[in-house]
Regions:
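N-terminal secretory signal peptides that target proteins for export/translocation
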Residues: 1-8
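Beta-propeller blade termini and top-face loops
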Residues: 27-363
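Bacterial N-terminal signal peptides
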Residues: 9-26
């Protein structure tokens, strides 16, 4: 479980602009000294923007050996432990980018590790990535496998038996429109990619969940968002849950029982599927009528369980206990724990020395 630290961001552009004004100031009357002479010995020092090295965005755990864990950080690269967290080593420092969105390990081959770059959260300090990376030797070496224009990859899911097949959730540019958003699929280990779900240039996908019993069935959380220098627009009519049953060839937007069924802007959505019964799907949905939702028929209909959804634009992760479909966790500034499927929550189960939980994995 992660504890995130925050730092003050100071706009470097504003500092450079101020210096530029001094250089471009009028020189005044003839005979005055050139103002650039006063700057010739000026030494620059870095004062920002700050990067979030301490914030953890995701875990990748080898399920056959949970002592092996990969951790992806907001701006500190990828770290690996082979002794259940006693010691850690950086394994991504030689790559061109250090901001991580998601880590996925192939269930059929734990040596195959995928990293999606670009922090998926929406802070002004969130750094953008340059695509998706693949390791065939458990993190010793990496190869960039494309998707550079996606900027932020929120989730990667891999076929349980064929490590060549995977899907990537692409959020796209945080600060403006771009077409490289949605869901991308590869069937050849990343050599080629197809954009199998595209909604529009403003709506990306923040989360994907794959049916463990039928891997051609997937749920995608579409998310319309836009950061500006002085604000954030975290929602729109095209956000929502989309479902495919044919490996991404066709998709439909799920609506029945969800808060946006009758309209209204929808924000960020988190998804999870119960491992013992894939009919059961949970979602936390940002909406004026949002909260925690449950489906018992693979997403065809939904029931609102409660209003809890802690600061969805910054968290929005929900996890189901693998042995109890009524025991769920929602992450936020505190850890929210429910024993009744999300009707009620307690924040007393987990104590922390610092707020903010962004990632969780349950054995």
């Amino acid at each position: 479980m992660d504890h995130a630290w925050f730092a003050l961001k100071m706009g470097l552009a504003a500092v450079v602009f101020s210096v530029g004004l001094a250089i471009l100031a009028p020189v005044g009357t003839v005979g005055q000294s050139n103002p650039t002479d006063k700057l010739k010995n000026l030494e620059f020092r870095e004062i920002g923007p700050a990067v979030m090295g301490g914030r953890i965005d995701d875990f990748g755990v080898v399920e056959s050996n949970p002592n092996i864990v990969y951790v992806g950080t907001a701006s500190g690269g990828v770290w690996k432990t082979t002794n259940n967290g006693t010691t850690w080593e950086p394994v991504f420092d030689k790559e061109d980018v250090s901001t991580i969105g998601d880590i996925a390990i192939a269930p059929s081959d734990p040596a195959v590790v995928w990293v999606g770059t670009g922090e998926p959260n929406n802070r002004q300090s969130s750094s953008w990535g340059d695509g998706i990376y693949k390791s065939l030797d458990a993190g010793k070496t990496w190869q960039k496998m494309g998707l550079g224009a996606t900027h932020h990859i929120g989730r990667i899911v891999i076929h349980p038996k064929n490590p060549e097949i995977l899907y990537a959730a692409a959020l796209g540019h945080l600060w403006g429109p771009n077409p490289e958003r949605g869901v991308y699929k590869t069937t050849d280990g990343g050599k080629t990619w197809n954009q199998v779900l595209k909604i529009n240039d403003d709506t990306g996908v923040s989360d994907i969940a794959m049916d463990p019993e039928s891997p051609d069935t997937l749920y995608a959380a579409a998310y319309e968002r836009r950061r500006t220098p002085f604000g954030f627009n975290g929602g729109g009519p095209d956000s929502g849950i989309y479902k495919t049953t044919d490996g991404g060839t066709t998709w439909k937007k799920l609506t029945k029982g969800l808060p946006y069924e009758n309209g209204g802007d929808t924000g960020r959505i988190g998804l999870d599927i119960y491992r013992k019964d894939s009919n059961i799907v949970y979602a936390i949905v940002q909406h004026e009528k949002g909260g925690t939702y449950r489906s018992d028929d693979k997403g065809e209909t939904w029931k609102k369980m409660g209003d809890t959804n802690p600061r969805p634009s910054y968290y929005s992760q929900i996890r189901i206990d693998p042995n109890n479909d009524l025991r769920i966790w929602e992450l936020g500034a505190q850890m929210f724990y429910s024993e009744d499927g999300g009707k009620t929550f307690s924040t007393q189960r987990v104590k922390s020395i610092h707020g903010d939980f962004h990632a969780m994995w349950i054995d």
